[in-house]
Design a protein with these regions (language model features):
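Helix-turn-helix DNA-binding motif, specifically the short coil turn and the N-cap/start of the second
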Residues: 4-9, 13
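DNA major-groove recognition helices of helix-turn-helix
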Residues: 16-18, 91
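A short LG(V/I)-centered, amphipathic sequence patch enriched
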Residues: 18-35
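Alpha-helical linker/hinge and terminal dimerization helices associated
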Residues: 20-21, 42-64, 126, 261, ...
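Hydrophobic residues within well-ordered alpha-helices
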Residues: 39, 113-115, 208-213
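Interdomain hinge and pocket-entrance segments immediately C-terminal to HTH DNA-binding domains
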Residues: 61-80, 94-98, 142-143
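C-terminal regulatory
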Residues: 108, 134-214, 219-243, 263, ...
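Periplasmic-binding protein-like
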Residues: 239-254
Length: 270
């Protein structure tokens, strides 16, 4: 009844399938017919094929109407990812067939990835916006960056003495997240660097390195608020350079999905 087919029609269909594949799909157990292992495999894999077919049809329909099937996004390491993924979740609820590919970028790396078409959308990229690259950029509220060290780091004793800090910083090791640029000139942000640096790959590594007392560095405050409250990290009384963050994409990219997602991200309160 659920299939809206007569029993005879189902039996005939199963018989034809068994003849074509030269296998048994059902076997008798008493008065009941049950699936053979081969039949169970066909059932399970058939469901996947049907789901894939539906998804393919949805993607083809969106593509035919100007909606690209995939968006590649570079999210800056200082970005509040909880806000980002909330917006992304709302977007995917409206566009379930869309594929999303997210990577993390640092400093110049995101702009370079956008310029060289490795990503379609840049979220949270630090300014300034590169000129004459054909980018459309929308400013968003930047993450508050705080200069911190571990409470047991030597600089912690000077945390409230700006003059002493200025003298000590050039001799203190900095913890720096690698710029992800592969072609363009990389850059650093935050402290004026001395000669001693420890480079890490991710913001998580940077936080752990600073908690371990390996050096100093700027970190988004929302990422370390718990450690500040616990007294494991100490904020240094230094002027923090003003920063500006952007959502950016190429002006030449007219994809409807990109435009819709960029608008949602731009309207969000970061």
């Amino acid at each position: 009844e659920d299939l809206n087919k007569a029993t005879s029609a189902l039996s005939y269909g199963i018989q034809k399938l068994e003849e074509q594949l030269d296998i048994s799909v059902f076997q008798r157990q008493g008065r009941r017919s049950v699936l053979t292992p081969a039949g169970r495999l066909i059932l399970n894999e058939g469901r996947k094929i049907l789901e894939s077919t539906v998804l393919l049809a949805d993607k083809a329909k969106e593509l035919a109407t100007g909606w690209e099937p995939k968006i590649r996004i570079a999210a800056e390491s200082t970005l509040d990812h909880s806000v980002f993924f909330k917006v992304l979740g709302d977007f995917l609820t409206e566009h379930e067939a869309m594929d999303i590919d997210v990577c993390e970028s640092v400093l110049s790396g995101g702009w370079e990835a956008l310029e060289h078409d490795r990503v379609d959308l840049l979220v949270g990229a630090p300014g300034p916006v590169p000129l004459q690259k054909g980018f459309r950029a929308v400013s968003i509220n930047p993450s508050e960056m705080v200069p911190v060290v571990a409470s047991h780091h030597p600089l912690a004793r000077l945390a409230n003495d700006p003059e002493a800090l200025k003298e000590a910083i050039p001799m203190t090791r900095a913890v720096v997240t690698h710029d992800t640029a592969m072609v363009d000139v990389t850059r650093n942000a935050g402290f004026s660097m001395g000669k001693k640096i420890i480079y890490v790959q991710t913001m998580d590594q940077k936080i752990e390195a600073q908690l371990a007392g390996l050096g100093m560095g700027h970190i988004p405050k929302f990422r370390v608020q718990r450690y500040l409250d616990e007294g494991r990290l100490v904020v240094l009384n230094l002027e923090t350079p003003a920063n500006e963050n952007f959502i950016a994409w190429k002006i030449s990219n007219k994809g409807k999905a990109l435009q819709a997602l960029a608008q949602k991200l731009g309207e969000e309160t970061w």
